[in-house]
Swiss-Prot record:
Cell location: Cytoplasm
Organism of derivation: Methanococcus aeolicus (strain ATCC BAA-1280 / DSM 17508 / OCM 812 / Nankai-3)
Top-level taxonomic group: Archaea
Biological pathway: Amino-acid biosynthesis; L-arginine biosynthesis; L-arginine from L-ornithine and carbamoyl phosphate: step 3/3
Keywords: Amino-acid biosynthesis, Arginine biosynthesis, Cytoplasm, Lyase
Biological-process GO terms, alphabetical: arginine biosynthetic process via ornithine; L-arginine biosynthetic process
HAMAP family, per the entry: Arg_succ_lyase
Family statement drawn from the similarity comment of this UniProt entry: Belongs to the lyase 1 family. Argininosuccinate lyase subfamily.
EC number from the UniProt entry: 4.3.2.1
Gene: argH
Reactions the enzyme catalyzes: 2-(N(omega)-L-arginino)succinate = fumarate + L-arginine
An example Gene Ontology molecular-function term: argininosuccinate lyase activity
Name the UniProt record assigns to this protein: Argininosuccinate lyase
A GO cellular component entry from the record: cytosol
Disulphide linkage map: none
Length: 487
């Protein structure tokens, strides 16, 4: 039987000897709050299975489950978070033994190790967070699509190398945010499949001699399947790596949006205005309106890459199966998860509240020869010359326009005469008109308003499917949790 203040983990092999600074250094309790709920559910499911398999008495199992539900309702902060107990698993078990006695509560851990327990907890906690991130992504995607629809005919300039390139619409530009975001959604949905597999029953790494039922706990906890190799069950953390890699990719995509919010809201671009609540001012320059939120988000998203590399480095060359090194993955995982969640909310709000300067956008399309490509294309179509030849001719038109401080319309005819080419004035005017440029580009993925409208509807249709899939998963997990709490 447990004595007062006796450490149930160390008492047998190690005795009562502990050193406070070592215990504080080793404990994972500071970040185990992320798996507290999952650990309770894991304990309940495991206990229920032990009862059904007649490994423990039903009356003992019922007492354990009822006490676990009390701990769940009271929360982690009501427990004795003694660092010498290492982690939340032993804290909960110690609390159970204190309240029920070791002869009852000491049976809960039968046929199980902390190794398969924590692996199960992590997967359960992470799947919840993945679904949260997916909900935020889907909501942001819909908001971007709504804004794109509003600006499907709003002319703006497109860039390559951050130089004026060709006219497009702002709606088309916004779809360039929606497109990679859809891939982010698909990656996380696919990753969920590999997160939602159950290691419980793997034991320390070699399963157990007790007649446990792994499929029963899999069903109770809402997993799709079990991990068939017990060594891999406790050792695998690639599901964490995959999730963090996906978050790094997502963060990279989001950082581009932040960068463009900074650029486009500057005086030099002046194409958008950020809402005041997403900016700050200077302590010395009273006129300043700084895009600090976008800058902070851009910086925070960089930490996702650092966290990923840290976890990769921790995992590199670890021997099978469980090593305590794995504990140090968790802070980096949860930091990436919460940085992603917080930043998605911020960026979504920032984009949804921008004010678009359509006049400035249109003005930029009329500068710096952005319609030169269509002029070359027109020469190909109307004069039946090779594109490379047309490219050279229009390049000369641009050069002469710059040298003589003229626009292309004032130079083109002299250059065409030089090459013995004829082109109607109406064709020239159409080729040099930014909106006509845009309207002609109606192939799939193009900036023509009708194509942007089609693309938006296509995105909406797919988003509805993703949203239903995510909501179904959330509903399933909520049912699982309610069922466990009502055992």
């Amino acid at each position: 039987m447990q004595k007062n203040n006796e450490n149930i983990l160390r008492r047998g092999r190690l005795g009562s000897s502990t050193k406070k600074e070592v215990m504080n250094y080793m404990t994972s309790l500071s970040f185990d709050k992320e798996i507290f709920e999952s650990d309770i559910f894991c304990d309940i499911a495991h206990t229920k299975m032990l009862m059904e398999q007649n490994i423990i008495l039903e009356e003992d199992g019922i007492k354990i489950i009822n006490e676990l539900k009390k701990i769940y309702n009271n929360g982690m902060d009501c427990l004795n978070l003694d660092p010498s107990l290492d982690d939340i698993h032993m804290v909960i078990e110690s609390e159970l033994i204190k309240n029920l006695g070791e002869d009852v509560a000491g049976r809960m851990h039968t046929g199980r190790s902390r190794n398969d327990e924590v692996a199960t907890d992590l997967r359960m906690a992470l799947r919840d967070k993945i679904l949260t991130i997916l909900k935020l992504l889907i909501n942001m995607q819909k908001n971007i699509l709504n804004l794109a629809k509003e600006h499907k005919e709003t002319l703006t300039i497109g860039y390559t190398h951050l130089q004026h390139a060709q006219p497009i619409t702002f709606g088309h530009h916004l779809l360039s945010y929606a497109s990679p975001m859809e891939r982010d959604i698909l990656r996380l949905i696919d990753t969920y499949k590999r997160v939602n597999i159950c290691p419980l029953g793997s034991g320390a790494f070699a399963t157990t001699g007790f007649n446990i039922n792994r499929n029963a706990t899999k069903e109770l906890l809402g997993f799709d399947s079990v991990i068939e190799n017990s060594m891999d069950g406790v050792a695998s953390r690639d599901f964490i790596l995959e999730t963090m890699a996906n978050l790094s990719i997502l963060g990279t995509n989001l950082s581009k949006i932040c960068e463009e919010m900074v650029l486009f809201s500057s005086c030099e671009f002046g194409t958008i205005d950020l809402a005041n609540e997403y900016t700050s001012t200077s302590s010395i320059m009273p006129q300043k309106k700084n895009p600090d939120v976008a800058e902070i988000a851009r910086a925070k998203l960089s930490t996702l890459n650092g966290n990923l590399v840290t976890v990769l480095t921790i995992l590199k060359a670890l021997p099978n199966t469980y090593n305590r090194d794995l504990q140090e993955i968790s802070p980096h995982l949860w930091d990436s998860v919460y940085t992603t969640i917080d930043t998605l909310k911020i960026i979504d709000g920032m984009i949804s509240t921008i004010k678009v300067n359509a006049d400035r956008m249109k003005e930029l399309t009329e500068k710096n020869y952005s319609t030169a490509t269509e002029l070359a294309d027109t020469l190909v179509r109307e004069c039946n010359i090779p594109f490379r030849t047309a490219h050279g001719i229009v390049g000369e038109v641009v050069r002469l326009s710059i040298e003589n401080n003229k626009n292309m319309n004032e130079v083109i005819r002299d250059v065409l005469d030089k090459f013995n080419l004829k082109l109607d004035d109406s064709k020239i005017e159409k080729a040099l008109n930014p909106m006509e440029n845009v309207k002609m580009r109606k192939v799939i993925g193009g900036p023509a308003p009708e194509e942007v409208e089609r693309a938006i509807n296509s995105y909406y249709s797919r988003i509805e499917n993703y949203e239903k899939e995510v909501n179904d998963k959330i509903e399933k997990i909520e049912i699982i949790k309610n069922n466990l709490l009502n055992l």
